[in-house]
Amino acid sequence: METATAHISRRCRPFVASAVVASALLVSLAAAIPAATGTTAVGAAFTQTRTVAHRHSVRPAYGWPVKPFNRQHPVRAYLNDPRNGHGDAKSFHFGIDVAAPTGTAVYAVAEGKAFVTRGRMAVAVRGASHTFGYWHVKPAVRNHQLVRLHQLLGYIVDEGSGKHVHLAERDQRGHYLNPLRPGGMGPYVDRTPPHVASIEFLHNGREVDAGALTGRVDVIAEIYDTTPLLVPAPWSNMPVTPAVVRWSLSQGSRRIRPERTIINSDHMLPGRLYDAIYAPGTTQNWVGAPGHYRFYIARGLKASRLPDGVSLLRIDATDTRGNRTLARVPVSR
């Protein structure tokens, strides 16, 4: 018998960690926010320029799972947020968390056949091309029942992780997609670029000055995005994962290291990559304890291969709407 768990996740627990993203993700940028400065843990200054993108005109494929369907709601957790607490194995968050009070009615964002697992507060609805999973929901439909668009599926229950419905979307290949991608769920407006909180350089686990690199160096940056709508307490002002993080290294017009993508959240990342993407010190959000999202920008960067003089390390973070933050830090050996 097919179950909701089989359709939503192959790992039967609430915290589990490729669709083609609409070409409008790479939009022209405008309305630059004044550059900000920061300091790494050992004092090397960096600058960041935050830029707001033009508004998207991509039509969403489906509306929200709570009423009103055509109005944006607060989202308190994003796809690929780190999950590493309470004894759970490290994993990527496999959907988004739409904040809503306990007892809120949850509705189907697309038609299909419902799959319900006895004793589990979740419903999956499999359609012609995509399967949608709704977690932390007490089902109001039967197993294998055909459901219509906007049909009542159940009601939000608080299973100890706060008041929300976790929405997951999978394609026919079983890949989890980002519901907040352009052409996914909508309406969704975001005018808040990500933040680069810190940039650290470590040699043998110890911090070194960006202007005196030696040996093999790991570069770690704490980067986070903010939610466009305020999430109700106690989950207000928590960080979320940027959609894309890239880095490059150059000197003048010469590209020393070509641009490399660290994370791309158009789909959920394989769990085996967790320790290659998130550096030690990364924590997920908890009530009263906002998380820290520490990304490996580079690992084992050979200082001896840097050219003489000062080079420029660039870290580029964007969200699903093209809002962008570009951080720059001078480095040398």
Feature annotation, model-predicted:
Residues 1-12:
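N-terminal secretory signal peptides that target proteins for export/translocation
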Residues 35, 43-123, 128, 148-149, ...:
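Surface-exposed, glycine-biased beta-strand/turn segments
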Residues 99-100, 138-141:
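Short alpha-helix capping/helix-loop boundary micro-motifs
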Residues 141-148:
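Short nucleic-acid-contacting surface segments enriched for D/E, G, S/T with interspersed K/R
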Residues 152:
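Glycine-rich acetyl-CoA-binding "A-motif" of GNAT/NAT acetyltransferases
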